[in-house]
Amino acid sequence: MQKPMIEHMTSCGDWAEKVLETNPWLQQLILIGPQAKDIEQLYREKDGLMNRKEISEKLLTFSAEEIHTGEDKNKISKMKKNLPVYISIDKDILDKQYTETNWSQGNMSLPMLERWLSHFLENGNILGIDICGECQQGIPLPEYLQAEELNEETNQKLFEFLSHYIL
C-alpha cells in the first residue's frame, strides 16, 4: 500500500497496514481491488513484524486481477460472517471513467464496486463508512473542475447506493 508523503501521517493507503499491525481486536481485514503487486508489497513489508500465517489469518485480499479473471469467487467463502463491519472506500480502485484521484488509478467499474459492497451491506451490521480518493489539487483549473464534477457524480451515485442500505 502506498506510503503517505508526510511521515507519521495516516493516509487512506496505509491505514490498513497500521490496523493489521496494531489492532488486537481485528477479526478480519478485507482488501478489495488493489493491484496484486500492491498486495504483495504489504506482505513483504510485514515480514518480520508478522509472519505470513498471522497475516493470512486476518487479511483476505481480492486483487484487481482476481476480480477481472473471476478467481475472486473462490475466496468469497473465506469472508467471516456476522461480524460488525467498517467500510472504507478508496475511489482510486475505480477506473478513470468514474473518478480522477491523486494516486495511482485502478480499473474497477462502479457497478462492480457496488456488487462487492452489497456483500457487506446486506449483513446489516455496519459500524461506519468513509469514502476517500479525491482529485489532486493544484492542477490547472479547467482539468480540476472537470475532475471535481466527475468525482461529485460518483460520490452522489455511491451515496444513493449506500442510502438504500443504511438510511
Where are these regions (language model features)?
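A generic structural signal for short coil/turn motifs at secondary-structure boundaries
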Residues: 3-6, 41, 139-140
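Distinct, well-ordered alpha-helical segments
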Residues: 12-15, 41-47, 73
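Short, flexible coil/linker elements and helix-boundary hinge sites characteristic
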Residues: 24, 28, 46-48, 53, ...
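Active-site-proximal loop/helix segment associated with metal-binding centers of metalloenzymes
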Residues: 33-55
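Catalytic cores of soluble, metal-dependent hydrolases
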Residues: 37, 53-54, 58-167
